[in-house]
Amino acid sequence: MNGEENSDSIPIDLILEILSRLPAKSITRFHCVSKLWGSMLCRPYFNELFLTISSARPRLLFAFSKHGEWRFFSSPQPQNPYGKSSFVATADFHTKFSQNLNICNYTSGLVYFSAMWITKADVICNPSTGHYAMLPKLLLTYGETRSFFLFDPVGKQFKVLLMNKINNNETKDIHILTLGTRKVRWRKIQQCPLIHIVSHEWICINGALYYIAYNIDDFLGYIVCFDVRSEKFKCLNLNQDCFSERSTKLIYYKGKLGVVNLKYAHGGGFPLKLCMWVLEDVEKQEWTTSVYTLRDEDRVVKVYYDLFIVGITATGEIVLAKKKVCKPFYVFYFNLERNTLLSVEIQGFGEYQSCCSVHAFVDHVEDLNVYAFVEHMKKTYEYDATSISPSEQKL
């Protein structure tokens, strides 16, 4: 029975309801069943239905690299796990991506890979299907680059912000690439008034990029804010204690920017102290400070300075994970309101249970609109193959 015959016996709305509960990778395959199915699965109604259901079951996305190949897994985030102190979850394999690139960041369901050096192109990848699109190269003649993959929720546009660094890691030139236009071209923009070194810690919140930076003169830490829509920079002061610990992470907590870091007990194990600063007033730059103690009550899990802060979930749980894949591999969920720590053993990584570095992202949601954007980039964009070097461009 072909797709057209099947649709006569089963209402289309019911078909869409059933399909909306499948993984995005399966939806991609079903586009090929027939023209009718391809048309149904492209409807805005179905895309929104799929996103609604996917948003109700956010997942923790993992990325591992081994021998030049990236593999993506995800596991369900605990839903109302109170009363438990530990349990086991199984990671689902999504896809592999054979490119020898450095992972850069994750935005709105897409993973952005940065080649880091001027001889290679950057890549945007769909972690559910492995489909990807390459970005046009910026013809720079020197140095290393630092990139940020950003999203403007008002203009519904993805942008890439690229900073060129000179020998002392000082930011020299800044360019931006707007995706979603017919012709994709790099533009040079005004630099931040603070001459600074860019760290690897950042977050994009409601169309604003925040990243930790260090003043080139006194090496004091700041938070630089970049408005994705207006493409303007400003700097925020912050208590220097935020930068003194082993692990520092920017988070989005109750609609506000936050900074968290860890302080280990003697010997590197539990209990851990988690310090959090929250920006209560942006204009006045007023921060509040909280300190929490994380305890592993069962004393089953052993950690020795090998945890990193993945982020904070939409339900307000700080997520910690081990820096290397090992067996057993644990993820920890600390609930700030209840002051409880949940230990989750993640199984199912297979051959990757051998000390690969871990990249993890909270609240991963599959979005068909975003995934279609990658395919649109590959098929219809006209890339500017002769992007202008800094010496030729004007502000």
UniProtKB/Swiss-Prot annotation:
CDD domains tied to this protein: F-box_AtFBW1-like
Residues covered by the F-box domain: 4-53
SMART domains the UniProt entry points to: FBOX (SM00256)
A Pfam family hit: F-box
Protein name, per record: Putative F-box protein At5g42430
